[in-house]
Curated annotation (Swiss-Prot):
Transmembrane segments: none annotated. GO terms for biological process: protein modification process. This is Peptide methionine sulfoxide reductase MsrA. It catalyses: L-methionyl-[protein] + [thioredoxin]-disulfide + H2O = L-methionyl-(S)-S-oxide-[protein] + [thioredoxin]-dithiol; [thioredoxin]-disulfide + L-methionine + H2O = L-methionine (S)-S-oxide + [thioredoxin]-dithiol. The gene is msrA.
């Protein structure tokens, strides 16, 4: 049995690298959701005019890890209090967003945000949006960290987030 989750929180390379290491996750696909344009390209998304968010689609086994646990990881590995940015990545395409795929996921997302809000210094600004169509990103964006670990962005941005995840969530590591 497999379920899917779609979340965005900054550059999709970061979330992809993290969720690829989670026990019970079968596949992580970088892509775009929440778009007003069909079949957007990376270049179009980067303009900030498509309403797309850079996201990852996580295919997981709910008997091994559930949706709520995935959201707890999501909120721990990015800053959900930053509006339309993560670090130096600025624009609506980098917004903190959850795209629930059904009403149950929507209710869980609302519950998790309400539960975690008091633990952050600033208010969580993560939005819950209708995903519309999920568009898979170009092939050169897939499995990015694993194929480019020495690239500057990977070393400076992704590696520290990955280390934080591995320290905080050892019980969820594959």
């Amino acid at each position: 049995m497999s379920e899917s989750a779609i979340v965005g929180g900054g550059c999709f390379w970061c979330l992809e690298a993290i969720f690829q290491r989670v026990k019970g996750v079968h596949r992580v696909t970088s892509g775009y959701a929440g778009c007003r344009r069909q079949n957007p390209t990376y270049e179009q998304v980067c303009t900030g005019t498509t309403k797309c968010a850079e996201v990852v689609k996580i295919d997981f086994d709910p008997h091994i890890i559930n949706y709520e646990e995935l959201l707890h990881i999501f909120f721990a590995v990015h800053d959900p209090t930053q509006l339309n940015r993560q670090g130096a990545d600025i624009g609506t395409q980098y917004r903190s967003v959850i795209f629930p795929l059904n009403e149950e996921q929507k209710a869980i997302a609302q519950k998790v945000i309400q539960k975690l809000n008091p633990y952050f210094e600033n208010k969580i600004v993560t939005t819950i949006e209708n995903p519309g169509t999920f568009y898979e990103a170009e092939s050169y964006h897939q499995n990015y960290y694993n194929t480019h670990p020495d690239q500057g962005y990977c070393q400076v941005v992704i590696a520290p987030k990955l280390k934080k995840f591995m320290n905080m969530f050892q019980e969820y590591l594959q």
